[in-house]
């Protein structure tokens, strides 16, 4: 996978891209990354990339020329996903991360001003994505967040593919509780089932714990999760148990 970032602050990506999983993915040549400072593509002597909005209003608007010119130098195809980081976009999710992990080329357009000239949105962008209902200074941090979520799903990036399959949201539920040594710590003990060696019982316990966690912390996810008849019975039994306690 090739990933390009159009940004006014390419140095912001250095720390994220040069450590941990993203660094290893590059070392394995599974991904290649490239930052492009689109200020280099400004068309006047002052390297101006923003201007006042037509019709008046607060703030500045990102000009179309630098972004269009920078995009011309990228080797795009019809399959290239050009992502605009903006609060108007569809909310980022594990499902979108999985979808984008299958792309061969992704371009992130990271703005840093009040808004974008609409022609950028309508003529260059394939996807508008938001990472939440809040405002950030620019699109760099959302692009980094998305990159991490996407790349770890590409086969071969993680040492153990089962790692991401057990993560929260990978199957629509939150992750089950995990424990390691020591077995007992300050009078807190590991559940016996995890030490039983019975893999079927362990898997059942983990699934039930995922249902419990999701019920308490993200009940909205259960509305979209394909609950089995056994799942529904377990949840009802758990609700009754809570009332009795």
From Swiss-Prot:
The answer on whether this UniProt entry bears the keyword Cytoplasm reads yes
- Keyword Transferase on this protein? yes
What chemistry does it catalyse, as a reaction equation? guanosine(37) in tRNA + S-adenosyl-L-methionine = N(1)-methylguanosine(37) in tRNA + S-adenosyl-L-homocysteine + H(+)
Task: Give residues annotated as binding S-adenosyl-L-methionine.
Answer: 111, 131-136
List, alphabetically, the InterPro entries matched: Alpha/beta_knot_MTases, tRNA_m1G_MeTrfase_C_sf, tRNA_m1G_MeTrfase_TrmD, tRNA_m1G_MTases_N, tRNA_MeTrfase_TRMD/TRM10
Q: Which Pfam families match?
A: tRNA_m1G_MT
Which GO cellular component terms are attached? cytosol
Which EC numbers does the record give? Answer: 2.1.1.228
Q: What is its main location?
A: cytoplasm
Listed disulfide bonds for this chain? none
Q: Which biological process, per GO, is one annotated for this protein?
A: tRNA N1-guanine methylation
Localization, per the record, is: Cytoplasm
Q: Which GO terms describe its molecular function?
A: tRNA (guanine(37)-N1)-methyltransferase activity
Q: What keywords appear on the UniProt entry?
A: Cytoplasm, Methyltransferase, S-adenosyl-L-methionine, Transferase, tRNA processing
Q: Which PANTHER family match?
A: TRNA (GUANINE-N(1)-)-METHYLTRANSFERASE (PTHR46417:SF1)
Sorted alphabetically, which HAMAP family does this protein's record hold? Answer: TrmD (MF_00605)
Q: How does it assemble?
A: Homodimer.
- Please give the function described in this protein's UniProt entry: Specifically methylates guanosine-37 in various tRNAs.
Which family, according to the similarity comment? Belongs to the RNA methyltransferase TrmD family.
Q: What is this protein called?
A: tRNA (guanine-N(1)-)-methyltransferase
Please name the source species: Staphylococcus haemolyticus (strain JCSC1435)
Q: Which gene encodes it?
A: trmD
